[in-house]
Structure formats: structure tokens, C-alpha cells
Amino acid sequence: MSTINLPLNLTVRVHPVVLFQIVDAYERRNADSERVIGTLLGSVDKGVVEVTNCFCVPHKEHADQVEAELGYASDLYDLNRRVNPSENIVGWWATGQEVTNHSSVIHEYYARECNNPIHLTLDTSLSAARMGIKAYVCVSLGVPGGKTGCMFTPINVEISSYEPEVVGLQLCSKTIGVQQNASRPRTVSPMLDLAQITEASDKLLTLLGEVLNYVEDVLAEKQQPDNSVGRALLDLIHSVPNMTSDQFAQMFNSNVKDLLMVVTLSQLIKTQLQLNEKLTSLTSFIN
């Protein structure tokens, strides 16, 4: 009889910063390295593994063994714990689209560092025209009194983002197609607050138009109604504060005035710092 001692209903949620760090480590790898590995950091709660950070572990793979700088990995983890004490080791990652023969050896080390570690693979070679991401757990198999082994079994993996990460991703998306279009800027900067409000308002108007079109199509029996969408719209309506147009205009104008005041003060501080820098340089030159 075979034995399986690990639940397979886990869900792995990976944050974009983890993917960026893996790609950066792959780009900085040694010329003789075929793949890069590292440690995954995060938390586990009710069957959900939240991967929020990671770091690279230098290693070399030979035909019959794996050499990894475990002392470096331990020191780096201890340093990270001082900054982020809530992040624990939850598994390890590797570049490539497949689980190799050395994966079980590396997994044994992480099994000593945490319970039920996960294994994350990222296809940095873009073999399928996209950066495929997969997650695995190692399932123990064996016969009582006989030989034992393990098998990497795929589990569900999702991309999850905090609100600041979404803002960063939106900025990164503006550089898509730079190589094909030389007229597009190679770098982007965060927009001013007023420009962000304008862009958000335009997006909100577009989304409201889509919602109105959906409601009108349902009322005209051009589209089948969806109960989940109806409940979401009802919750949205209930979340809107009950106020008159004059009250809303007064509140909006007050917030805009506060925003303009903050922008003005920040520009004054920036100008003062630039002036102070020039005066300091001039004083040093005179002396």
C-alpha cells in the first residue's frame, strides 16, 4: 500500500515582486549556469501559501550531486527576518519549465527548513511564448517495509497583488512595445496627482458605461441576467454615500483644495532643496 502524507488542495498566491526578483536573478546568473534556484518567503494560512518575497541561492549542479551555499542562504534569511519577521520559508523556486533529477535533493533540504515546502518553477526561456509559472508539492510514496520515494504533484497557483504593486505594474505596462516603437519613451515616471485623478475619472466613466450597457441589455432581454453580477451591483449601490449633489460638490472641492495645497508645498520644498544644493556647491567652489 502506498502512503501519501500531504494534502493536495493547496493554493499558491505569488506576488509580482517575486517574479521580478526571479527574472532579475536569472539575468544576473553566471555564464555556465543553466538554471537559478532560491528560497521562497511568505506565510501559510488555511491552505493558502502567500509568497511575498524570495532570494537567490548560489549553487552548482553536477551530474551526480548539487552544491549549494547553504550558509549564505541561512545568513540571508536571518537578515530578512530582522526586517520582515512575518515572512517565513515556505519553499523554493527554480527557473525552467520542468522538474529535474536534482529537484528532489534540493527539496529535501527545504523540507528540513519548513513543513510541506512548495516548489515553484518559472519558465524564463519563454519556450511557450510566455513566462509559464507552475507550483508543486512533493508527495511521499512508498510501500511499508520497502523502498520509499517522492513525486512532484502540480497544485493551483495564482498571481496576487497588493494595491501598491498594481500601481507599479500599471507603470511597467506603459513601456510595453518600446523595442518595436522607437518613438515611445524607454522610461516612465509616476504621474502627478491631478493627472492620476483625471485618468482614474476617465476609467471610471468607461466602466460605468459598460455597467449601464449591461443593465440596459438585461432590461431589454438582449442578455441573460447573472445573479452574481446583480448582487455585486446592489452592493455597489449600497456603498455609495447618501448625499445631495451640493454636498458631494463641496466635499470634492475641499479634497481638491487639500490636494493642490500638498502639491504646492511639495514643489516649494523641491525648489528649496535645489536652491540649497546650488548654494552649497557655490560656497564649496569659493572656498
UniProtKB/Swiss-Prot annotation:
One GO MF term attached to the UniProt entry: metallopeptidase activity
Superkingdom assignment: Eukaryota
One GO cellular component term noted in the UniProt record for this chain: eukaryotic 43S preinitiation complex
Principal location: cytoplasm
InterPro entries per the UniProt record, alphabetical: eIF3f (IPR027531), EIF3F/CSN6-like_C (IPR024969), JAMM/MPN+_dom (IPR000555), MPN (IPR037518)
Alphabetical list of PANTHER family matching this protein: EUKARYOTIC TRANSLATION INITIATION FACTOR 3 SUBUNIT F, EUKARYOTIC TRANSLATION INITIATION FACTOR 3 SUBUNIT F-RELATED
Subunit structure: Component of the eukaryotic translation initiation factor 3 (eIF-3) complex.
Full protein name: Eukaryotic translation initiation factor 3 subunit F
Protein source organism: Aedes aegypti
